[in-house]
Amino acid sequence: MSGSQTLVVKLGTSVLTGGSRRLNRAHIVELVRQCAQQHAKGHRIVIVTSGAIAAGREHLGYPELPATIASKQLLAAVGQSRLIQLWEQLFSIYGIHIGQMLLTRADLEDRERFLNARDTMNALLDNRIVPVINENDAVATAEIKVGDNDNLSALAAILASADKLLLLTDQAGLYTADPRNNPEAELIREVHGIDDVLRGMAGDSVSGLGTGGMATKLQAADVACRAGIDVVIAAGSQVGVIADVIDGTPVGTRFHSLETPLENRKRWIFGAPPAGEITVDDGAVFAIMERGSSLLPKGIRSVKGDFSRGEVIRIRNLNGRDLAHGVSRYNSDALRMLAGHHSQQISEILGYEYGPVAVHRDDMIVS
């Protein structure tokens, strides 16, 4: 749909519990209603949810457990299914399906796993399914630490090629000082660059049930803005906050990115040294240069070098002239097998498929 946006909404434990010891279901119902409203308008919504540990603690009757990683993992293992069941139940009221994605930092730092996660995310969004993301706290170890889901939401926004990231919290945004302790604290409305002064304003506050504070939200905002994604930190209790963010209505603190996600990605492609190269026929040259099309396996004549899926490669014509640089959807061995074949034959030849193109147009810079 023309004009549709992709919005990642991160809900911290303080928002989901309302500062209490249990999930605030009435508040979650309202947030789902807002998300469903925007989904119906054609926008793509991604949820990054905290609250698994809080849900587990509530379900087990608030047991007295030692403050250890194992205790957190126990509570997360119990609470994760309860939490996803709640999201599924509430979105189903509006006829919306959800898809659960449990991630760890390793899934996002390894290139192959990152691409697989991105493909899953895109498949869900393309089919109008709302991805609900949480860290896999039941198996992660070092990842259960301050700010992890804040940082995870920034990485999820990159995975989704999001237009905006909304970090919902129990504060109206970023202040010049802690408003709970300083009555003269002022809300910062617009941020065009994150520096040490701003980091000092964020402090290191952490809520009792969650693992994040304003400082980690600032870290997440920095990561997302560098990837070309605008970020808003706002109160989860703000009426109509999700619509306001999508519509561009001033709310909370807005962090402006310096470029679009596509511009950021293409700048990275331009600067990355090619890991290999492929030669394409005249039909592929015409499709790329004149039609702005993706490169299909059918147009590949030869493959040079050994490279992995997700690496940048050089694309040349039959005379050896550089045409473009792009990110390969398949590794070099796979492309050698696919060269000259139709896209419909990919699964038959390889036994798997990452899509019909060898290099997508959005992952390509023409020389």
UniProtKB/Swiss-Prot annotation:
**Binding site residues for substrate:** 50, 137, 149
Where is this chain's protein located in or outside the cell? Cytoplasm
Q: Output the GO biological process annotations, alphabetical, semicolon-separated.
A: L-proline biosynthetic process; proline biosynthetic process
Q: Which UniProt keywords apply?
A: Amino-acid biosynthesis, ATP-binding, Cytoplasm, Kinase, Nucleotide-binding, Proline biosynthesis, Transferase
Using the record's annotation, list all stretches that form the PUA domain. Answer: 275-353
Q: Which reaction is this enzyme known to catalyze?
A: L-glutamate + ATP = L-glutamyl 5-phosphate + ADP
In the UniProt record, does the keyword Cytoplasm occur?
A: yes
Q: In which pathway does it act?
A: Amino-acid biosynthesis; L-proline biosynthesis; L-glutamate 5-semialdehyde from L-glutamate: step 1/2
Job of this protein: Catalyzes the transfer of a phosphate group to glutamate to form L-glutamate 5-phosphate.
Name the record gives this protein: Glutamate 5-kinase
